[in-house]
């Protein structure tokens, strides 16, 4: 019997994602000026206010207020009508030094013996539902909002009422064997201007205006947004969006008040959006604002790198990898692999895990080096998912008061590279 499964995403203007992006932009500035920085930066955003807190050990000095305002401005909160404006919001910092007790567990005389920054469990996942080896429900949810943001920033004339905050949700019908059959429901809630005014001050007139706005936005989503998004996908995904697919746009009828004015945002509150959309387990640790000594982040990236390369190598059609660490200890405490019955090799999942341990050095320092994590690469991860993204090289610029602009050529999303496929095929005899 077929079943339904759903994932959601949120836009870069969602309050929790505003917080994530500020935290990661601050991290990037520290990493750009001192790649050995230890950073844990949390952000709270609400009506007209940004609060920064956390712990830092670094030789760099960064302008926290300027960074926060730049991020808010780039996202699109640049009007007083939003009640959260880059140029007028308050920015309060309570960032202080890193605990010496934590630092002693991380730093070692021999860098390769660097201990994990905390205990914890981290998961990585990959499957064959999409070219990016991500769950279709989440991949589509991200793609819808990425394209909506691009329209808002680059082709606003197509949907001139758009504001930064938005959410999406995609439900897919799967076969009993777990294969996507069709897209059952798409939900899009997008913040918008109050662009149709009521004829008079009555509630009836307001209801008519609200209904007309909702109808206009729904038509534009159907006519402008959806064709652009589905054009990115293979034909089987395009066919999955059929005449029976339900489209729900702004189901409450109106979404004018949004962003940090509508809901307070906090760093680390969208961890399922950031990872696998509920299709795989999550260890509970958030990513944004954390330097790679925090295995919550670096080991989760390593686990995705392993899972993706295993699937791409043909070891299995679906792979879940769990890693576990103890604070101050370099080697992982455990490595677990689950292929959910999709393995193409004559080995148990435990034997696959043993080979993974032999192929991949999973000490924190080795992960940092292999994935090039001691670089300012994190702001780009903080919206539209940390996984399923395209690896690419870019040049990033960071403004400083003392050194002018500092340029870094960096490689983004290195954990998405399929650079271990040949090695794995050889080790597994494929």
Residue ranges, per PLM feature:
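N-terminal, positively charged regions that mediate nucleic acid binding
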Residues: 1-40, 45, 421, 427-430
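Glycine-rich, mobile lid/loop segments that gate access to catalytic sites or pores
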Residues: 6, 66, 73-257, 388, ...
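Conserved phosphate/anionic-ligand binding catalytic regions in large, soluble enzymes, centered on
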Residues: 8-10, 14-19, 115-130, 256-281, ...
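Alpha-helical support elements that line or immediately flank enzyme active sites
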Residues: 12-31, 126-150, 290-314
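Short, charge-patterned binding micro-sites
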Residues: 39-59, 327-331
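Internal helix-turn-beta structural module
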Residues: 46, 318, 325-430
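A structural-propensity feature for long, helix-poor, extended segments
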Residues: 48-50, 154-179, 313-351
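C-terminal catalytic subdomain
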Residues: 271, 276-320, 331-338
């Amino acid at each position: 019997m077929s079943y339904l499964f759903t994932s959601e995403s949120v836009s870069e203007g969602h309050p929790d994602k505003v917080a994530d992006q500020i935290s990661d932009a601050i991290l990037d500035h520290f990493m750009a000026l001192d790649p050995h920085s230890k950073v844990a930066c949390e952000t709270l955003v609400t009506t007209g206010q940004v609060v920064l807190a956390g712990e830092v050990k670094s030789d760099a000095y960064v302008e926290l207020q300027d960074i926060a305002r730049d991020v808010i401005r780039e996202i699109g909160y640049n009007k007083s009508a939003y009640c959260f404006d880059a140029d007028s919001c308050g920015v309060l910092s309570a960032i202080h030094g890193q605990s010496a007790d934590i630092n002693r567990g991380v730093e070692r005389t021999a860098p390769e013996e660097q201990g994990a920054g905390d205990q914890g469990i981290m998961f990585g996942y990959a499957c064959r539902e999409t070219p990016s080896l991500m769950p279709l429900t989440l991949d589509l949810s991200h793609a819808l909002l990425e394209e909506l943001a691009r329209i808002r920033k680059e082709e606003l004339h197509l949907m001139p009422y758009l504001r930064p905050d938005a959410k999406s949700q995609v439900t897919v019908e799967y076969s009993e064997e777990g294969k996507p059959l069709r897209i059952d429901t798409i939900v899009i809630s997008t913040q918008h201007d109050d662009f149709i005014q009521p004829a008079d001050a009555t509630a009836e007139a307001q209801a008519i205006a609200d209904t007309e706005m909702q109808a206009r936005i729904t038509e534009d989503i159907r006519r402008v947004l959806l064709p652009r998004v589905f054009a990115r996908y293979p034909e089987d995904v395009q066919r999955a969006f059929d005449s029976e697919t339900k489209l729900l746009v702004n189901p409450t009828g109106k979404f004018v008040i949004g962003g940090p004015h509508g809901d307070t945002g906090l760093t680390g509150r969208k961890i399922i959006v950031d990872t696998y959309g509920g299709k795989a387990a999550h260890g509970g640790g958030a990513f944004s604002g954390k330097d790679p000594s925090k295995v919550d982040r670096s080991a989760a990236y390593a686990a995705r790198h392993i899972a993706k390369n295993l699937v791409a190598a043909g070891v299995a059609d679906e792979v879940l990898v769990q890693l576990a660490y103890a604070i101050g200890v370099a080697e992982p405490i455990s490595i677990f692999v689950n292929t959910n019955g999709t393995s193409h090799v004559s080995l148990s999942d435990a034997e696959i895990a043993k080979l993974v341990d032999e192929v991949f050095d999973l000490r924190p320092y080795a992960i940092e080096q292999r994935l090039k994590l001691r670089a300012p690469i994190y702001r780009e991860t903080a919206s539209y998912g940390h996984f399923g993204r395209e690896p690419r090289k870019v040049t990033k610029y960071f403004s400083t008061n003392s050194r002018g602009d500092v340029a870094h050529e960096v490689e983004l999303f290195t954990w998405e590279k399929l650079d271990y496929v040949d090695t794995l095929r050889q080790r597994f005899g494929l």
